[in-house]
């Protein structure tokens, strides 16, 4: 069931983030992530929803609203969107993106940003974003200073 995520969900979020980290690369810092989530979940400028079932969190989208430092514009941007491999192909991610989009529109933002940067089905994810009305904008580049962190990425 898709619902708002709360501080009580942090262990389930971290468990899903571990799966994401195993798939995308060893990037998770569980203690820091838990601390940050405990601080931001429930804030008016933070969107956090997930498909949470008895067996854990299957899918999540967490985003935030912020003013752009150089533009006269307010952005809603996702911080993470991820679906457990066992539950891909369903409608969970679609529902989360639509909910995030509606939330951001209600917050009267100027732009909404979604990214596919984990190296997990980036093409498929990009097509999903496009089907939901999002347009490709620009180019995102990574420079791996610590290359071992990005060994699994096909960026």
Name every feature range the model reports, one short phrase each.
Residues 113-124:
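Conserved beta-strand-loop-alpha-helix junction that forms the acyl-donor binding cleft
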Residues 1-30:
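Short amphipathic alpha-helix that is part of the acyltransferase structural core
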Residues 79-89:
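A short, internal acetyl-CoA/4′-phosphopantetheine-binding micro-motif in the GNAT/acyltransferase core
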Residues 1-8, 147-155:
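Conserved N-terminal entry element of GNAT/NAT acetyltransferase domains
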Residues 115-117, 135-147:
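Conserved catalytic-core motifs of GNAT/GCN5-like acyltransferases
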Residues 26-48, 61-71:
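A conserved beta-strand-loop-helix scaffold within acyl/acetyltransferase catalytic domains
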Residues 95-111:
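Conserved acyl-CoA
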